[in-house]
């Protein structure tokens, strides 16, 4: 049966895309808006606050697309109202705000999660399967790179570049995807982090460059480099997992644009007979945010909130990612390595 979804906020870079995804998703018969949606909200039913969602037909789920300073406030009200809720990453400015949402969810039994959409990416699914199959053996080394278009190209006056509204910079907003995927693909929690950050543009007060070295509880060590640093192209984005028997590289963006491909080199059959193997793992197309992946993400969350199946991530994953980010910031401030709890 088609459900009813509420989109909350509107002042988020992904809000318009998610609105299109929700509108075209076959699992929803109606979209209700709450917040500031401007010209995009003209054709939809609207409510002035969360209480208004309870005055009409029941809402099956909500998706919060708001500023980081506002998102946890919206989410808290939704969970207390008994509405299963997705919150755009990184959910909040601090891990304490995420922990509060987890506590409310535990006490009310209302499910919530964040939009770690890349967990559904075909390249990510394949990498995780390959590691599970022993293709690279015991994991020893990880690298992640999230280098993207410069702050100048992204509008320095945007709320994303002010600590009061965003909470942090490149590590907080974009590299949090990389932070999450390392843990997800490796099936291993972080143990330590050491980092340096830099803010080189005077008009912003969050980091535009971050470099973090980390340890995983399984013994591997790794590195994440993130930067708003490209004056022309969009991205230089990749991940590498190395083990005792091989390595796998995911080249997500390069000079030619998006090229979702895996490069596998392994001493394990059936890979050992070739020097290396390239596999194309493109993201499925489609409109809205994330194309078909975005649609599938909403469908899976709706089914999970109804108890039909488990979801691909939860509030604990959001908490782990933000604790890593905060640990990196603390390390950059103190010059010391920070221990991370699981």
Residue ranges and their predicted role:
Residues 25, 240-316:
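C-terminal glycine/acidic-rich active-site capping loop/insertion
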Residues 118-204, 335:
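Predominantly a Rossmann-like dinucleotide-binding segment in NAD(P)-dependent oxidoreductases
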Residues 42-104:
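Beta-loop-alpha module in the N-terminal Rossmann-like domain of NAD(P)-dependent dehydrogenases
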Residues 87-88, 112-114, 143, 224, ...:
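Hydrophobic residues in well-ordered beta-strands that form the structural core
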Residues 100-118, 138-142:
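Rossmann-fold dehydrogenase core element
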Residues 1-2, 7-8, 23, 39, ...:
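C-terminal helix-rich "cap/oligomerization" subdomain common to oxidoreductases
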Residues 1-43:
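N-terminal Rossmann-like dinucleotide-binding module
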Residues 173, 180-256, 295-307:
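Contiguous beta-strand/loop segments that form the cofactor/metal-binding neighborhood of enzyme cores
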